[in-house]
Swiss-Prot record:
GO MF terms held by the record: GTP binding; GTP cyclohydrolase I activity; zinc ion binding
Self-association and partners: Homomer.
Protein name, UniProt field: GTP cyclohydrolase 1
Reaction(s) catalysed (UniProt annotation): GTP + H2O = 7,8-dihydroneopterin 3'-triphosphate + formate + H(+)
Cellular component, GO annotation: cytoplasm
Gene3D superfamilies: 1.10.286.10, 3.30.1130.10
Residues the record lists as binding Zn(2+): 73, 76, 144
Length: 188
């Protein structure tokens, strides 16, 4: 199911009129095109097909930390900006290091809830690696919360984990490792 850019353009023009703007005035004339192109880019994750190649690995924890992402909140269609940290314990093989950020991009390129995004990344990493031992921590600023309503710039942190990461000492080891890559240090 692709993006219907013509319908988006028509809807954006109607929104501009509904808020008292003239969609034909200078500065807004190309806004419907820009919004349609933006939404096409930011919601094409369902079309992503990440190919995985497995390599010889070890049984030690693999961590990819500080993966920057942006996605749109499905409630307000406003951006969430954040970082994701992923760890897994290989069963005996590992996937290429670039594949984990690709998984993050795949699921962030659709309308999202942060908690669902975190679970989807965990499940895809588990499926791709064949590991039942995966942990994902996602931190994000929600612009819907920053610019409207409560107007708070507090980030949301969500975690999903399974397998050996149910052991709190392993979670703490992961959290200690990713500390330098956490959102408050990484996006500033």
């Amino acid at each position: 199911m692709g993006v219907n850019k013509a319908l988006i353009k028509q809807a954006v023009k109607q929104i501009l009129v509904a808020i008292g703007e003239d969609p034909e005035r200078e500065g807004l004339r190309r806004t419907p095109d820009r919004v349609a192109n933006m939404l096409e880019e930011l919601t094409n994750g369902r079309e992503e097909n990440v190919q995985y190649t497995l390599f010889e690995g070890s049984s030690n924890m693999v961590i990819v930390a500080g993966i920057r992402f942006s996605t749109l909140c499905e409630h307000h269609l406003l951006p969430m900006l954040g970082v994701t940290h992923v760890a897994y314990i290989p069963s005996d093989k590992v996937i290429g290091v670039s594949k984990i950020p690709r998984i993050v991009v795949k699921y962030s390129r659709m309308l999202q809830l942060q908690e669902r995004l975190t679970r989807q990344i965990m499940n895809e990493v588990s499926s791709a690696t064949g590991s039942g031992d995966v942990m994902v921590l996602t931190e994000a600023y929600h612009t819907c919360m920053m610019i409207r309503g409560v107007r708070s710039a507090s980030p949301l942190v969500s975690m999903a984990y399974k397998g050996k990461f149910n052991d709190s000492s392993l979670r703490l080891e992961f959290l200690e490792y990713i500390r330098p890559f956490r959102l408050n240090k990484f996006l500033t």
